[in-house]
């Protein structure tokens, strides 16, 4: 009788893949127009000069340049804005 009794079945044991959100290009990095800067849910980061925002709140570069993160205050809350500065302007700053 070399039989093995059936083991119980688990009702857990599954997981969904991560959605790969987060900052993709950091301050001081060079970017090309169209590069994705941040994937996010809602506006954790706000678009500044040279940055566009997609339907899903993805921030992307509109121009070639250098990424700059800036903290600012609005309604007594500290928020973060992301700019893409042209290479000449970034060198001067």
UniProtKB/Swiss-Prot annotation:
UniProt GO BP: translation
A family per Pfam: Ribosomal_L27
Keywords linked to the UniProt accession: Ribonucleoprotein, Ribosomal protein
An annotated Gene Ontology molecular function: structural constituent of ribosome
Chain segments annotated as coiled-coil in the UniProt record: none
GO cellular component, one term: cytosolic large ribosomal subunit
Domain of life: Bacteria
Keyword set includes Transcription: no
Region (Disordered): 1-26
Annotated signal peptide: none
Family statement drawn from the similarity comment of this UniProt entry: Belongs to the bacterial ribosomal protein bL27 family.
Name of the protein this chain belongs to: Large ribosomal subunit protein bL27
Annotated organism of origin: Solidesulfovibrio magneticus (strain ATCC 700980 / DSM 13731 / RS-1) (Desulfovibrio magneticus)
């Amino acid at each position: 009788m070399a039989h093995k009794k059936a083991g119980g079945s688990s009702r857990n044991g599954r997981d969904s893949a991560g959605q790969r959100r987060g900052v993709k290009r950091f301050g001081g990095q060079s970017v090309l127009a169209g590069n994705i800067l941040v994937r996010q849910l809602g506006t954790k980061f706000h678009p500044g000069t040279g940055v566009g925002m997609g339907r899903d709140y993805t921030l992307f570069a509109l121009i070639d340049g250098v990424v700059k993160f800036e903290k600012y205050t609005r309604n007594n809350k500290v928020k973060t804005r992301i700019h893409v500065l042209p290479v000449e302007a970034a060198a001067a700053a």
